[in-house]
From Swiss-Prot:
Keywords: ATP-binding, Differentiation, Isopeptide bond, Nucleotide-binding, Ubl conjugation. May have a role in hematopoietic cell differentiation. GO terms for biological process: cell differentiation. This is Schlafen family member 5. ATP binds at G578, L579, P580, G581, S582, G583, K584, T585. GO terms for cellular component: nucleus. Belongs to the Schlafen family. Subgroup III subfamily.
Amino acid sequence: MSLRIDVDTNFPECVVDAGKVTLGTQQRQEMDPRLREKQNEIILRAVCALLNSGGGIIKAEIENKGYNYERHGVGLDVPPIFRSHLDKMQKENHFLIFVKSWNTEAGVPLATLCSNLYHRERTSTDVMDSQEALAFLKCRTQTPTNINVSNSLGPQAAQGSVQYEGNINVSAAALFDRKRLQYLEKLNLPESTHVEFVMFSTDVSHCVKDRLPKCVSAFANTEGGYVFFGVHDETCQVIGCEKEKIDLTSLRASIDGCIKKLPVHHFCTQRPEIKYVLNFLEVHDKGALRGYVCAIKVEKFCCAVFAKVPSSWQVKDNRVRQLPTREWTAWMMEADPDLSRCPEMVLQLSLSSATPRSKPVCIHKNSECLKEQQKRYFPVFSDRVVYTPESLYKELFSQHKGLRDLINTEMRPFSQGILIFSQSWAVDLGLQEKQGVICDALLISQNNTPILYTIFSKWDAGCKGYSMIVAYSLKQKLVNKGGYTGRLCITPLVCVLNSDRKAQSVYSSYLQIYPESYNFMTPQHMEALLQSLVIVLLGFKSFLSEELGSEVLNLLTNKQYELLSKNLRKTRELFVHGLPGSGKTILALRIMEKIRNVFHCEPANILYICENQPLKKLVSFSKKNICQPVTRKTFMKNNFEHIQHIIIDDAQNFRTEDGDWYGKAKFITQTARDGPGVLWIFLDYFQTYHLSCSGLPPPSDQYPREEINRVVRNAGPIANYLQQVMQEARQNPPPNLPPGSLVMLYEPKWAQGVPGNLEIIEDLNLEEILIYVANKCRFLLRNGYSPKDIAVLFTKASEVEKYKDRLLTAMRKRKLSQLHEESDLLLQIGDASDVLTDHIVLDSVCRFSGLERNIVFGINPGVAPPAGAYNLLLCLASRAKRHLYILKASV
């Protein structure tokens, strides 16, 4: 018997086929015990896998004829902690178990059948349950001097008991060193935390292999100890194993192999092996050798020793797979990010109240919270069904005759809820768009399962499969990304407009039935589900993930989401103006993902163009399988025969020295093989750092045009400074900017109340500037920042190489008290090309365009302010998220 994923199911779910099973309380009691245990194990693995993978359905063929669920019960042995996640149903000769996702509010991040981590509790070798295992693992991550395993697992005995254990340990050590024992000798040594007695069974090798992993795991994970095979655990009498039944060489090899195969997980860097010593103690009877006691001394282990791989499962790549030890441990140890160094961020979805695969969601403290965004995008009213978004459904109704009547007819049975329209829910979920889909609409209403309507212009054989896949993907995203913990199924319904087949279910009524508990959708459930939907639609992997060391999601701003929602077939060309820190590059990356799915593109069909290598490398790292990133120079030097769509970022800093880049980009996209492609250009004239012609069309010809005016990057003092510099830039624009280019149509919105630091220091000589930077870097590193938080930027590229060695010399000069501080800074300085690595960036303002760091030093070596100086200053200052130091040398 094995588990397989039913890929031909009519459910929009992950369905695990468990094969044949005997059901019924009495019937299972009467069956062969081994078969009963095996069937139960198969079902539990399927349950565990679905709990950890977003939920789904277990389908089993009922083996015993005449079975009736209502009369006979089930008879499966399911752990109590799992039962509240399950609903059961019989359908003819199949038994269905509906599994909802694991909820981390249970106190552990994922479902586990058995941790296979053991510990000693007085005289017992016990397996740790999931919560005990989690506490143990957290304890093991502490420094060795702070580790007290016993304290982490329960209250300790009084001091007298500790003394008693110490005496036993001494006696056990003496017993371990004895060369011979007497048959039936009664040992003056009871079992304890440090001592375990095990009798040999008939099959010596099997006995050792069965008991030894648990004993070694328990002693290694507690305080070390001794296990004596061949001593009666109740009478403490020496029995041993008869010499005729034991081969010492073979048994030693078996024990060595068994211990070496035990899974271990290291939190330390030394990574030692399990330390143990094996002795065979002779057992004599009336002066003659009768047999042997096998004694094993196990040392306390630095980290974690498992008896075998944890019994925890997941669905991955259409297979039910057991989690490897390393992956299980890492998953168990996942925790919310430490935002103490990110005061501008607020946690909105915590790992402690979500689902196993969800990630923490953080938003800027000045942004609308998750609940407010849900009410903005997806409001819930008690007296009507709300259609949203208004602009989209009105456009669809005006373009497609009969669509309004069709939708209104479908909504008649519902008195309350929200109907969310989309040009393609498939694209919204990261799937490829299907031709012939007019629109999709998701209905969430009280006391009903959510329904996904797909409106086709005509029926074909692929309609059913498409709607099933989209419904399944939506459910998985709501649970695994959105963190929804309730019971959830998405019912797909296909409608064909202007056809005799007005609306038709994609599967028969037999398979539409879900347990009644899945229909229990209260207003509170609706709001929770819609908040998960906000995360699904607006969530993206934050660049903070690299800084925090774990994946974190941010949410798009309102304007970013509005632009992302545009119909790309109708908005082939767009100029997007955005202030520094408004998220232009993030939006550019998301737009390329959408292009891929709307137009069924390969990475070779989508080109991302920017001016500088560092930004190109960042995009290449972030979106390896989405696009082909190049610089403007590379774009102008080469032909791109397969390119159909182009995204241009930081366009205000492009030049025409290598030719008309805008004309070339427009020609490529307008003459693409499959029709006109997408050309979106992101720019900000305020961040122009050169005096050459940019090659952009005049602002009056940049149509259609959109603006992103909400700035969320910078701390309050830096944001205030940027506003001052922007005003100066308007009054003193560089000569190469066309009239009106620094006029924003909408008033900028700046982050307020975010703590940070701004220092402007003038009239220093260059040597004083370099010493200041070196000392400040050391101070920041001592106070919790890392090299990857810091960028030192010069106003000109030529200055970087000119003064680099002098800055390094300043870094080398340390007082005696500093000799044992941070690791060698000389090995932690590099340019902006590898901005994601853990080093201090030393580069020019121009090459750092489009990037950011928590701490930025801007160095002006003391030249007369050139034309466009304020724009260059804006480029510099806007790179800093929390601390900005502007150091000006005297002219």
